[in-house]
Amino acid sequence: MKPTPSDWPRMSSSVFYQDAVAAIQWLCDAFGFEIRLKVEGDKGQIEHSELTYGEGLIMVAQETPQSERAWKRAMRSPKSQNGATTQSIMLFVDDADAHCAHARARGAQIIEEPATHDYGEDYWADRSYGAIDPEGHLWWITQRLRNPPAK
């Protein structure tokens, strides 16, 4: 048996929001994600969703601080934590500048303008920008310009 289902990447992240319905719509509109699955609870809240970007996948859900399950109580939006975040999410795109312009027009807070980062001829070069989504999650949007040479 393969350890990973055929339609899943080996690693994925879960991102929690106070308003997961609005977050999913925003992530699709601003960043270009597509909804693969959305499971709504009896009050319309998002219990689970899967959003794809190319072959990448993230899960988005409603934060539930009153949940009976300890892990669900622990998962919070930065908006619930005075804007504090302890991680970022990296997304590779085809054109970082065009993606930034599109995201900015849809309300992304750009915290670092697109810039080229060249780590030398033995390494890679990227063009990337940093953005904060409406609930405070930090995103690094990156375009690979050059791969490291084959060894």
Predicted regions and their residues:
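Vicinal oxygen chelate
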Residues: 1-14, 24-25, 31-132, 141-151
